[in-house]
Amino acid sequence: MKVKTITRGTSLTRLNDQDPVKRNLDPSLHPFERAREYTRALNATKMDRMFAAPFLGQLGRGHQDGVYSLARDTKTLIDCASGSGDGAVKLWDASERCERWTSKAHEGIVRGLVFSNQGDVLSCASDRYVYMLNKQDGKVKRSYLGDSSLLDIDTSKGGDLFATSGENVSIWDYSRDTPVTKFEWGADTLPVVKFNYTETSVLASAGMDRSIVIYDLRTSSPLTKLITKLRTNSISWNPMEAFNFVAGSEDHNLYMYDMRNLKRALHVYKDHVSAVMSVDFSPTGQEFVSGSYDKTIRIYNVREGHSRDVYHTKRMQRVTAVKFSMDAQYIFSGSDDSNVRLWRARASSRASIRSTREENRLKYLDSLRERYKHIPEIRRIARHRHLPTNVKKAAEIKREEINSLKRREENIRRHSKKGAVPYEKERERHVVGIQK
């Protein structure tokens, strides 16, 4: 009699290998596939909220005064600098959450911080000085004297240039003691200046006169001036889409603009209940983070008008500065309670090493959550957040005010001649005018 046996080669398997599972993917054999996937998506959403723990801790023992500026080193993942109201600049090691050095360089509030292309720290303050601090020990390598109080600073990624803003926008060369070029358009103060990451000769500034001005170093002249309804407090360029930038406004919203067409905003981002003080793009260009006067930090997807997450703590006060880390996994925040805090960009993510099976499982659950995110139950769980009482109450009052204004406008339109009260588009409402 002939007996058939199953044999396996010992060289093809290992002791801890998982037995392969044979699956037939024919849909007719899986009539309950959709129900199973919905259950998995629901459980994955619940587990995601259950493991959400965004706050990692504060860096060191903080400052002696409020933190008003932050900078990240674009060549490393762990270096972050902060400037405070007492004129001190500190360099932090994010991996150890400790302080490397402190430099008491300035006599006034450190308004602007940035890392130079060589890795040194550039700081500016209301005492009119710009100091280049050695990254290794914090000692002053070089100083520059401006014409007036300096409110912001940024470096060009394409050369040895940096820009400062105050009464005007000044372009400096590292090797010169005086500005190479000065830009002026109007007579008001300019608290914000930012270089484009990709088009390195283009920069933007925001003024106290509610203006946003685009400059081009190749023509040594301003290009366009946008006038908005309320003042812009912060600007950040998209590192992946060279023409787009987001602006944080005093009207609690953020606006995405295309520098080629400033007649309307590309997107309007809502949810804050007080002025937006700082905004910064993720290195991926898909998300950005904002810090507000309402003591919260919000993370936005560039294609969604509402925040995907909101961070807050009981002790954190008004957020004055936020920055993404260069790997887009962490967020630095500075507030006027003198602390620099470290957050996860994904509240439920962990930095531990994952096996291939675990990585594939997480990707599968992410795809299920994305597929079923519009189901009411899953959407409710994914969107639910606990907010401070004052923020929740302010949001309710703001919602009632907006609905009241809408009803009033609709009543006026209903009792007026047809076409006398035109509809005002949301993306054009914030724009007052454009000058060239």
Curated annotation (Swiss-Prot):
<dbReference type="GO" id="GO:0005634">
    <property type="term" value="C:nucleus"/>
</dbReference>
<keyword id="KW-0963">Cytoplasm</keyword>
<feature type="region of interest" description="Disordered">
    <location>
        <begin position="411"/>
        <end position="436"/>
    </location>
</feature>
<feature type="compositionally biased region" description="Basic and acidic residues">
    <location>
        <begin position="423"/>
        <end position="436"/>
    </location>
</feature>
<dbReference type="InterPro" id="IPR051733">
    <property type="entry name" value="WD_repeat_DCAF13/WDSOF1"/>
</dbReference>
<feature type="repeat" description="WD 3">
    <location>
        <begin position="145"/>
        <end position="175"/>
    </location>
</feature>
<comment type="function">
    <text>Required for ribosomal RNA processing.</text>
</comment>
<dbReference type="GO" id="GO:0005737">
    <property type="term" value="C:cytoplasm"/>
</dbReference>
<keyword id="KW-0206">Cytoskeleton</keyword>
<feature type="repeat" description="WD 2">
    <location>
        <begin position="105"/>
        <end position="143"/>
    </location>
</feature>
<keyword id="KW-0677">Repeat</keyword>
<dbReference type="InterPro" id="IPR015943">
    <property type="entry name" value="WD40/YVTN_repeat-like_dom_sf"/>
</dbReference>
<dbReference type="GO" id="GO:0030515">
    <property type="term" value="F:snoRNA binding"/>
</dbReference>
<comment type="similarity">
    <text>Belongs to the WD repeat DCAF13/WDSOF1 family.</text>
</comment>
<dbReference type="GO" id="GO:0000462">
    <property type="term" value="P:maturation of SSU-rRNA from tricistronic rRNA transcript (SSU-rRNA, 5.8S rRNA, LSU-rRNA)"/>
</dbReference>
<dbReference type="GO" id="GO:0005730">
    <property type="term" value="C:nucleolus"/>
</dbReference>
<dbReference type="Pfam" id="PF04158">
    <property type="entry name" value="Sof1"/>
</dbReference>
<feature type="repeat" description="WD 7">
    <location>
        <begin position="314"/>
        <end position="353"/>
    </location>
</feature>
<feature type="repeat" description="WD 6">
    <location>
        <begin position="271"/>
        <end position="310"/>
    </location>
</feature>
<feature type="repeat" description="WD 5">
    <location>
        <begin position="227"/>
        <end position="267"/>
    </location>
</feature>
<dbReference type="Pfam" id="PF00400">
    <property type="entry name" value="WD40"/>
</dbReference>
<keyword id="KW-0539">Nucleus</keyword>
<protein>
    <recommendedName>
        <fullName>Protein sof1</fullName>
    </recommendedName>
</protein>
<keyword id="KW-0853">WD repeat</keyword>
<dbReference type="InterPro" id="IPR011047">
    <property type="entry name" value="Quinoprotein_ADH-like_sf"/>
</dbReference>
<dbReference type="GO" id="GO:0072686">
    <property type="term" value="C:mitotic spindle"/>
</dbReference>
<dbReference type="InterPro" id="IPR007287">
    <property type="entry name" value="Sof1"/>
</dbReference>
<feature type="repeat" description="WD 4">
    <location>
        <begin position="176"/>
        <end position="225"/>
    </location>
</feature>
<feature type="repeat" description="WD 1">
    <location>
        <begin position="62"/>
        <end position="102"/>
    </location>
</feature>
<dbReference type="GO" id="GO:0032040">
    <property type="term" value="C:small-subunit processome"/>
</dbReference>
<dbReference type="InterPro" id="IPR020472">
    <property type="entry name" value="G-protein_beta_WD-40_rep"/>
</dbReference>
<dbReference type="InterPro" id="IPR001680">
    <property type="entry name" value="WD40_rpt"/>
</dbReference>
<comment type="subunit">
    <text>Interacts with snoRNA U3. Component of the ribosomal small subunit (SSU) processome composed of at least 40 protein subunits and snoRNA U3.</text>
</comment>
